[in-house]
């Protein structure tokens, strides 16, 4: 598995509850651009329309050697999931008010592009502060243990 890009902001802004692996519908120049230069997850999210899941605001830069038929960098891209998974996602988003965010995009062992999406709940500002405090405390404890071996 070759990871192309990860959404680091997702882990700090959301509590991730569940993850799914989804295929993604891409054009040829998009796959070439992913192999060449990667992707940008800034402000990307998933939306469900007509029983299909779409990935919005994922920026895949244009392919350098492309011609006039090059792709639009921020077009909505359809995610390929089983119907059961889509229905489960719809239920969680509507009933519990959760959001679907992409966390990782990668090539699997067969060379196919996959997106890891997560069902997540947004963190409040005080939750983020608590996480930072916990990280600092753990860092200090580990530093203390290293010194006093």
Curated annotation (Swiss-Prot):
Superkingdom in the source lineage: Bacteria
InterPro entries registered for this protein in UniProt: SmpB, SsrA-bd_prot, SsrA-bd_prot_CS
Alphabetical UniProt keywords: Cytoplasm, RNA-binding
Pfam families listed in its UniProt record: SmpB
One MF term in the entry's GO annotations: RNA binding
A cellular component term, taken from the record's GO annotations: cytosol
Annotated GO biological process: trans-translation
Subcellular location: Cytoplasm
Family to which this protein belongs: Belongs to the SmpB family.
The protein, known as: SsrA-binding protein
Gene: smpB
